[in-house]
């Protein structure tokens, strides 16, 4: 699934901006499928997480993000950026059928759908909250593989902060929600990078709450 030119432009701009603010390291990119649709399951600590994934993961296949409408469209400029880049699937509470169709459509077109299955931002580095089951249903219905991702370093942000993105295992889920969710939880925990508080000065610490 090819992305429009505007996506490539915005992605390059994002990488330049974020790369000037943080020291981002991507580990295990060779584990990502090179073609075909798949799901990404990642822990979630900060507003910056989806922008990091857009900027550092491959541009093709194109990534689509699930996000609560109230969170992704809560600021005018954020709404403009996300609409400009496209690839956003807004989530409305209780509208499961429409959501399943939107996710299935993106996968059927050969895209990638990234989900933060905790359903909310975490409170501590290196920890994973209880996962919601929707991601197992999406994988089972679409028969798309699922790739586990781990993020570390985004809970608190400051200029020069090191941020790690780690690509974990690829799973083939089988439609048994209980056992599938155990497998997803284990793979996501394995993918979590080790985080050590660097200490020292924290310039521009206001970045932590910039876009909340």
Residue locations for each model-derived region?
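Catalytic core of membrane glycerolipid acyltransferases/transacylases, capturing the structured
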Residues: 34-94
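Short, basic, glycine/proline-bearing loop/turn elements
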Residues: 13-14, 84-90, 119-121
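Non-catalytic C-terminal accessory region of glycerolipid acyltransferases
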Residues: 2-5, 36, 97-212
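Short hydrophobic helices that act as membrane-entry/anchoring signals
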Residues: 3-22, 79, 83, 208-209
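Glycine-rich, highly charged phosphate/nucleotide-binding loops
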Residues: 21-25, 93-100
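Helix-to-loop junction immediately C-terminal to a conserved catalytic motif
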Residues: 14-44
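A generic structural signal for well-ordered alpha-helical segments
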Residues: 17-19, 58, 82, 106, ...
